[in-house]
Amino acid sequence: MIAFALMCVFGVQAKGLKGKTIYLNPGHGGYTSGDRPTATINHEQMDTLSFYETRSNLWKALEAARHLRRDGARVIMSRTRSGYVTQSQMDEGILNENQESHALPSEDKVDKRYNQVETTDDGTGQQQIVGLERIACQVDSIKPDYFLSMHSNAHKNGSTVNYLLMLHRGETGKPYFENSDSMARVMWPYAFDNPLSVWSHYSADKPAVVGDISWMGGTPPGSPNRIGVNGYYAVLKFRAPGFLVEGSFHTYDPERQRLLNRDYCRLEGLRYYRGIRAYFGGKPEKVGYIAGSVKSATEKMEHPLYTYREGSIDQWKPINYCMVYLYDSRGVNIKAYHTDQEWNGIFAFFDLKPGKYTLRYRAYGYEELTEEVEVVADKTTYLLPHLTQK
């Protein structure tokens, strides 16, 4: 019903994803000081196991791509790995054509200033691109039907600000490229649907969909056919319909801990897929999902790197190393999930047949908890179990 209503409001035609070209840009790409390294409870700032946008953005994009390709879309990703080029590659400026043979300008070599640019081939011929000018050139060459750049936002470390934000090229309500504003507005309710996080601003029916010039200031390019450094940190330089999404704020401590969990990021990518699919009028999935965060029923989380919004679900201590067992309607244990040690309590089960299931939670020092849940096709059932100390 949501997808149908949005199609009516924005004039989206129900054609589906088959044959559509979707360009996904997981923001950043390396493990440098420019890739938003931030200390977490278990890891120092520049530890590659700590938070970097590089890793979380890629996890989101890979999951979105998995679903889009399954639905018949042609998906191009600016990168599929995280890392650095070797010094010899930097010296030689080696570049290969990407998997779709859309070559960048031949004179455009690897810039030695960008040591976060990745190696050129992931084994499938996929070129790895990080530089913003280079991404813009590739997007303009491919001319995708939909562009999406995935990021997370930043405020002051320890701030409780945490909201979803979508930016297109141009001014608010006046995108430089037709349908960019509509794409973001169709996406919004899907992306906003995350009960595992705590939003500080906006709502499902009050979106933050803005033009980059209106939001950040800058010099309008004068013509959509000119690439200029303007607007939102010069990210939106391309000439194609689409937008950039700041999925949350990694400077909100509990959210940063969640972004260390790959499956939490996959859930965000799944929501983006749903928004893209809705825009093109694609068919709903036949499978459903379960996701949640296991927390203590009585203990509040206290740590210098864990400032939470007062009165929110984030005040309760996430439980590390909790075993979550999934049983089908016959009582057969079909899957299990071990929450990580990163103080987020996240668990998730993907691609489940619709029906009734039972979840059993077991963690050292806590009473066992069992709950029933129903999986619905094309939906994620979110749970927030709280365990009582023994």
Predicted feature descriptions by range:
Residues 1, 5, 9-390:
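Catalytic-site microenvironment of enzymes
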